[in-house]
Amino acid sequence: MKMIKAIVRPDKVDDIVDSLENAGYPAFTKINSVGRGKQGGLKVGEIFYDELPKTILLIAVNDDEVDEVVGLIKSSASTGNFGDGKIFIQPITEAYTIRTGETGI
């Protein structure tokens, strides 16, 4: 099992979620946040924005689903500009459903 953590532009979240749902991946956790990447913020006129709004999507998948889900996120989130985001893949050693006690995702 893997945890896909995608940090994306908030205005692309609906496109990403629609893409994931249409492909059979309806489960996710969404966290609104702020941050910046390598670009170090954004200057508009005389105003410098040190931190920009971002959304973190957490999606737990089986190992054989990682490439498909990452591809869906990349194709839905990309604008071709700085600030499109980053995707991290982390191993999940165990997962439990609180209500039932079942293991796995």
Curated annotation (Swiss-Prot):
Superkingdom of the organism of origin: Archaea
One of the GO BP terms on file: nitrogen fixation
Entry similarity comment: Belongs to the P(II) protein family.
Gene Ontology CC terms, in alphabetical order: cytosol
Function, as annotated: Could be involved in the regulation of nitrogen fixation.
UniProt keyword list: Nitrogen fixation, Transcription, Transcription regulation
GO molecular function terms noted in the UniProt entry: ATP binding; enzyme regulator activity
SMART domains: P-II (SM00938)
Record-annotated disulphide pairs: none
SUPFAM superfamilies linked: GlnB-like
Protein name (record): Nitrogen fixation nifHD region GlnB-like protein 1
InterPro entries hit by this protein: N-reg_PII, N-reg_PII-like_a/b, N-reg_PII/ATP_PRibTrfase_C, N-reg_PII_CS
